[in-house]
From Swiss-Prot:
The modification Phosphoserine is found at S314. It is a peripheral membrane protein. This is Sialidase-3. A motif (FRIP motif) lies at residues 24-27. GO terms for cellular component: caveola; cytoplasm; early endosome membrane; lysosomal membrane; lysosome; membrane; plasma membrane; recycling endosome membrane. Its EC number is 3.2.1.18. SUPFAM superfamilies: Sialidases (SSF50939). BNR repeats lie at residues 129-140, 203-214, 254-265. Palmitoylated; may regulate intracellular trafficking and anchorage to plasma membrane and endomembranes. Expressed in brain. It holds the Pfam family BNR_2.
Length: 428
């Protein structure tokens, strides 16, 4: 078994077998605390193209202290439907039952996303499998398409979950991030698929995974792949934070005060750039083990006052006052370059409900990079990042890196920087 420690460089878990052959893409990562185990998922493809996806694969990582030993790759053949390709792994751990739910979509044949959108006829199925033993064995597949989407599927040209992890809220609700290409107009009995626009939304369960439902589309902004994190303010009120991919050169952020049923109007974060056409990114929340004294006055006494967040309207803002650190912090991973997918960065936000509070990025990987997924180990001060990377292309491998909260604080060069001040990243 391969071993990774918190002080080591990134370790490849899935490696491209041939430049025009078998490729692994679309990472997803969760940590199962009772088993001290990471579950690292990816798509196995016959080429790097989306339409050449085959099935999902898994590697289990057993953690001892600040090191992880990885078991060999395992193909998840139960996560399949006949005549379909399996895509977009999105796992979530349910803490009461101990179940791991692995959501994904199954898409007919080799039809491309563009073909799905133009036809206006959804060929995707919403499915999951589950495990009671931290990924050793898995249930048979369950198709939730009719249960969750139902007749509304006629307005969805296509949809997908994740990719990346889902979460469980303090209330017990399980959340699976998703997006759908929504067709708003019909002309008599005919769809108008060219009008389809993507919008993020949440799929959720309030009964430990027995039944599932979907929330409202996040509008009006075009948003695609997203992840969410629960933020607890100083007053103890939970807010669900959503970070979504956009084609608008900046990341979209939105907040929900009803556990993800609906979100307020999203806004663009000018501190978090997107490359052309955007890229998936990951976000996790965590409670800091300690707040270093030097981080209390993050920008200095002469710095501009912290702005109230445009995300959350003042009538429902849970924070007692501006400029206070939240009980929850956010960590975010994404390519840092505005022009192309290179230089994977880790950003820290110590006041998620305030504006302009993202740190400069700590560069975890220099060079081509792509999709990523983060996992936070509660009460351990440890984090895992599973990410696409390479020396010439982003699809050469999917690597894993383990790091500590102290490493983050030592690399992000202070925190709440004002807009436009986070242009100089910290290299690893």
């Amino acid at each position: 078994m391969e071993e990774v420690t918190s002080c080591s460089f990134s370790s490849p878990l899935f490696q491209q077998e041939d430049k025009r052959g078998v490729t692994y893409r679309i990472p997803a990562l969760i940590y199962v605390p009772p088993a001290h185990t990471f579950l690292a998922f990816a798509e196995k493809r016959s080429s790097s193209k989306d339409e050449d996806a085959l099935h999902l694969v898994l590697r289990r990582g057993l953690r001892t202290g600040q090191s992880v030993q990885w078991e060999p790759l395992k193909s998840l053949m139960k996560a399949t439907l006949p005549g379909h390709r399996t895509m977009n792994p999105c796992p979530v751990w349910e803490r009461k039952s101990g179940y791991v739910y692995l959501f994904f979509i199954c898409v007919q044949g080799h039809v491309t996303e563009r073909q799905q959108i133009m036809s206006g006829r959804n060929p995707a199925r919403l499915c999951f499998i589950c495990s009671q033993d931290a990924g050793y064995s898995w249930s048979d597949v369950r198709d939730l398409t009719e249960e969750v989407i139902g007749p509304e599927v006629t307005h969805w040209a296509t949809f997908a979950v994740g990719p990346g992890h889902g979460i469980q809220l303090q209330s017990g609700r399980l959340i699976i991030p998703a997006y759908a290409y929504y067709i708003p107009f019909w002309f008599f009995c005919f769809r108008l698929p060219y009008r389809a626009r993507p919008h993020s939304l949440m799929i959720y369960s309030d009964d430990l995974g027995a039944t599932w439902h979907h929330g409202r589309l996040i509008k009006p902004m075009v948003t695609v792949e997203c992840e969410v994190a629960e933020v607890i303010g100083k007053a103890g009120h939970p807010v669900l934070y959503c970070s979504a991919r956009t084609p608008n050169r900046h990341r979209a952020e939105a907040l929900s005060i009803d556990h993800g049923e609906c979100f307020q109007k999203p806004v663009l974060s000018h501190q978090l750039c997107e490359p052309p056409h955007g890229c998936q990114g990951s976000v996790v929340s965590f409670c800091p083990l300690e707040i270093p004294g030097g981080c209390q006055d993050l920008a200095g006494e002469d710095a501009p006052a912290i702005q109230q967040s445009p995300l959350l309207c003042s009538s429902v803002r849970p924070e007692p006052e501006a400029g206070t650190l939240s009980e929850s912090w956010l960590l975010y991973s994404h390519p840092t370059n505005k022009k192309r997918r290179v230089d994977l960065g880790i950003y820290l936000n110590q006041s998620p409900l305030e504006a302009a509070c993202w740190s400069r990025p700590w560069i975890l990987h220099c060079g081509p990079c792509g999709y990523s997924d983060l996992a936070a180990l509660e009460n351990e001060g440890l984090f895992g990042c599973l990410f696409e990377c390479g020396t010439k292309q982003e699809c050469e491998q999917i690597a894993f890196r383990l790091f500590t909260d102290r490493e983050i604080l030592s690399h992000v060069q202070g925190d709440c920087s004002t807009p436009g001040m986070n242009s100089e990243p910290s290299k690893k």
